[in-house]
Every structure is written in C-alpha cells, then in structure tokens.
Amino acid sequence: MSTEAANVQTLKEAYRRWHDSKGASVDYWFDSVVAHHISFGSVPRGAAPLKFAAQYNNDVELRGYFDGLLSEWSMEHYAMDEYIAQGDVVVARGSCAWTHKKTGKLCETPKVDYWRFKGGKAIEFYEYFDTAAAAAAAT
C-alpha cells in the first residue's frame, strides 16, 4: 500500500470511529493519528463563542480542543465522503452536524479538513467549516 493510501485509510478509520461513537473516540485519534508535535488549527482561531476552535501546537494542548468541543456540543453526524491525497497531504471533505448543549440549536455544516503526515502520523491539521452557522447555534 502506498503512503498516500495508508494515510487515507488511517483517516477513514478514525472518522468512522468518530461518527459511530458520536465523539467518544478521542483516544483513538491520539493513539493512531496525531503526532506529539502536531500543529492544529481551526478557522475561528479561538474567537468567541468557539474558543476551543483555536491553534494548538502539540498533542497535550490539543486535548483542550476535544474537551471544549465535547463539553459544549453533541454530535449528530460526521461524514467524510471524499479524500484527496498527494504526497504527505490528505484533504477530507464531507459534512457534520452538532447540537449546542446550552442553546439546543443545531449546526449543520460542510466540513473540509487538511492533514499533513510524516511517518504515518499527522503533524499538521487545519479545519474549515461554516463558522457563522456554528456561532449562531452557540448563541
């Protein structure tokens, strides 16, 4: 299996578990996908009301993303339907829906994740989603 195919397979399995567990598979991401020194970013860049969606520079800090996400939101679905791989980069495209626990509002959004791998582990990640819809659901 090529490195590109292996990286795609790693992500397919992680996203499958993420969806099936409704977000309870955080440890799998850390054990099987994320490198210790990952650069992890998100379009909101930590702006309220999506403070957890910020820049993280290692796996220890990155726990804050998942803690914030899962304490504030409940996953409805998460589906990555398309993967594009070139060299050490994989782009995953799909959609997800989350309900904000405090407001009860639903956010459905297209989702694009950019990944860069080295030695089978993700060293860079950046996510793109409808931040206006997420902010509206959170307020």
Language-model features: locations:
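A beta-strand edge to alpha-helix "cap/lid" segment located at domain peripheries
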Residues: 2-5, 67-139
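Hydrophobic pocket/interface hotspot
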Residues: 11, 25-30, 34, 38, ...
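Generic anion/oxyanion-binding catalytic loop in active/binding sites
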Residues: 15, 51, 104
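A solvent-exposed, acidic/Ser-Thr-rich amphipathic alpha-helical stretch
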Residues: 28-87
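Hydrophobic alpha-helical core bundles mediating ligand binding, dimerization, or RNAP-core interactions
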Residues: 11, 15-18, 34, 66-69, ...
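A structural signal for well-ordered alpha-helical scaffolds and beta->alpha junctions
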Residues: 4, 8, 22-23, 59-66, ...
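Short, low-complexity N-terminal intrinsically disordered segments enriched in polar/charged residues
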Residues: 1-32, 139
